[in-house]
Amino acid sequence: MFDLTGKNVCYVADCGGIALETCKVLMTKNIAKLAILHSVENPQAIAQLQSLKPSTQIFFWTYDVTMARADMQKYFDEVMVQMDYIDVLIYGATLCDETDIDGTINTNLTGMMNTCATVLPHMDKKKDGSGGLILNVTSVIGLDPSPVFCAYSASKFGVIGFTRSLADPLYYTQNGVAVMAVCCGPTKVFVDRELTAFLPYGQSFADRLRTAPCQSTAVCGQNIVRAIERGENGQIWIADKGGLELVKLQSYWHMADVFLHYMQDKEDD
């Protein structure tokens, strides 16, 4: 169980849709500080959030998830002046544009990895932080493939692979930072807009998705926070159809068994 009371939360996402609803729930958890990082500011949404809990400090910084790692490091050095420390990092920036493969990969995957790598030293209990939690908000088509949104699905599969890798005890026992992911099912904010399939053969299916049943952003946001509070390091959750379900992870190639000797410390030999 993870208690959000008094925690400093950094949320990388737009201040609308699922992110806004998640932040609304976070504001009911007596968090100390909330930082929202995105390329476009939404003053109305931030004012709405502040009205929910005036005692919680809210910050907004303009943030480009595609910036170079060196620039990110300078950026977060400035963020930390106001935040002091980060207990929870939530990465929810996402792009589904099958006509822009580079943008989709850079936003959903590369930007997430660079952000995590940049923020981790500020959370690492052996460095500048006291441990904490990283939550990657991803998609159910990062678990099962999508013949319609191939690039988007590939980027989300990458998020799952990175999350599970970073959650390995090799890191967690040292830095004290748990890493999890929540895979959101079809949500209203996603299907309400025009969608383009990777290949023309899938376009009729993409068009029909706009009328498919989907969960509300409010319910999805509630379940994202539930996953934070209930989850443990390495877990992957599905937030779909108004519910929250833990994914039963399976290993097909047991790396530790095959390379155990090479993965041991020299002192263990």
From Swiss-Prot:
GO terms for cellular component: cytoplasm. The keyword Oxidoreductase applies. NAD(+) binds at residues 11-34. The active site is at residue 152. Keywords: Oxidoreductase. This is Alcohol dehydrogenase-related 31 kDa protein. GO terms for molecular function: oxidoreductase activity. It comes from Drosophila lebanonensis (Fruit fly). Belongs to the short-chain dehydrogenases/reductases (SDR) family. Substrate binds at residue 139. InterPro entries: ADH-rel (IPR002427), NAD(P)-bd_dom_sf (IPR036291), Sc_DH/Rdtase_CS (IPR020904), SDR_fam (IPR002347). Disulfide bonds: none annotated. The keyword Endoplasmic reticulum does not apply.
